[in-house]
């Protein structure tokens, strides 16, 4: 073979290998500039605070800024679409939350598909809810509540911040599993005054928002919505102990646009796993009502798919439509 031809073949082989080498180099140097975490909720809510805690820790660990970018609107769909349309390079991430899985079967005419277009990167944790009633309601346990509700169909009102919210669909899952008839009352302001006064008889709430009233005896906790008891309410039983197959919780994690390099996903997953395992970070997450749970990208993807499937059944059962 002539020397010129050999040089040409070596050059061609080198060029063919260039994309793979660039991907490897990119993964090794990631992140090399600031990373944005898009949050589809206003500042100050629990998921936003959790995202800022993770962002701060990642900034310290990786030597690049992780910036929380709040983009509320259209449920969480505005933020999700922004990330879907971003360059799939690991520099625009999504704070994926339970609302994404709940909204997926409600908003069916969007320009994206949550499971198809968002890559699961890392789980941060789950937020247990608690079933609470006012002391005036003659039910001290979940079986007593179910019996009372069936004896008084349509006479128990439950509150939520709106149709399709976690507080709403968690109760609808309870209805689906138990067959009780309850009346949904959506609120645009605080639900607690009416609940404390007994004008609303039921609320499924994130634990931090009602913990003080439970401890003061102003509200009665009947069950937590996770499969096991939680540290904040050790004497409150898990719903599954009364209602087989019931499990519902808020959750949050990190997603990225489809096509994000595997190396960048792996780096983020490992670093976020280390962050949520850090005792100081873990304590702060628990203080927010978030139970830290790390997963591999594959495990988190399977979890998200299961959540979408579960809430699709509940949305259909309850006839929930876009507002």
Predicted features along the sequence, with ranges:
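N-terminal export signals
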Residues: 7-27
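Conserved functional loop/turn residues at catalytic and ligand-binding sites
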Residues: 12, 29, 34, 70, ...
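Immediate post-signal peptide segment of exported/extracytoplasmic ligand-binding proteins
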Residues: 24-37, 87-91, 146-156, 215-216, ...
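N-terminal (or domain-start) structured segment
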Residues: 26-115, 155, 180-201, 294, ...
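An extracytoplasmic/periplasmic, membrane-proximal ligand-sensing/linker region
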Residues: 32-34, 177-180, 262-323
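Hinge/capping helix and adjacent helix->loop/strand transition within the periplasmic-binding protein
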Residues: 85-90, 105-190, 239, 251-284
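C-terminal lobe and pocket-closing loops
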Residues: 126, 209-278, 306-309
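Ligand-binding pocket segment of bilobal, Venus flytrap-like solute-binding proteins
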Residues: 155-236
């Amino acid at each position: 073979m002539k020397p010129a031809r050999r040089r040409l073949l070596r050059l061609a082989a080198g060029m063919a290998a260039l994309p793979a080498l660039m991907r490897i180099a990119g993964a090794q140097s990631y992140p090399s500039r600031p990373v944005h975490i898009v949050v589809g909720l206003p500042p100050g809510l629990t998921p936003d605070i959790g995202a800022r805690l993770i962002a701060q820790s990642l900034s310290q660990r990786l030597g690049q800024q992780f910036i929380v970018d709040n983009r509320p609107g259209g449920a969480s769909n505005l933020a999700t679409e922004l990330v879907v349309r971003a360059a799939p390079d690991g520099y625009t991430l999504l704070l994926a939350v339970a609302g994404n899985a709940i909204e997926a079967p409600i908003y069916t005419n969007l320009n994206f598909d949550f499971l198809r277009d968002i890559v699961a990167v890392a789980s941060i944790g789950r937020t247990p809810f608690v079933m609470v009633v006012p002391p005036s309601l003659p039910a001290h346990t979940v079986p007593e509540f179910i019996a009372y509700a069936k004896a008084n169909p349509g006479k128990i009102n439950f509150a939520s911040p709106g149709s399709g919210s976690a507080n709403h669909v968690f109760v609808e899952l309870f209805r689906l599993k138990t067959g009780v008839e309850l009346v949904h009352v959506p609120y645009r302001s605080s639900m607690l005054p009416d609940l404390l006064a007994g004008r609303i008889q039921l609320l499924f709430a994130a634990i931090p928002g009602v913990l003080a009233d439970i401890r003061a005896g102003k509200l009665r906790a009947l069950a937590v919505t996770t499969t096991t008891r939680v540290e904040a309410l050790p004497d409150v039983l898990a719903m599954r102990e009364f209602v087989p197959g019931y499990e519902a919780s808020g959750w949050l994690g990190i997603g990225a646009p489809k096509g994000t390099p595997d190396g960048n996903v792996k780096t983020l997953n490992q670093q976020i796993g280390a962050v949520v395992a850090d005792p100081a970070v873990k304590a702060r997450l628990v203080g927010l009502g978030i139970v830290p749970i790390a997963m591999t990208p594959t495990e988190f993807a399977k979890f998200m798919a299961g959540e979408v499937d579960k809430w699709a059944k509940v949305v259909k059962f309850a006839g929930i439509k876009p507002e």
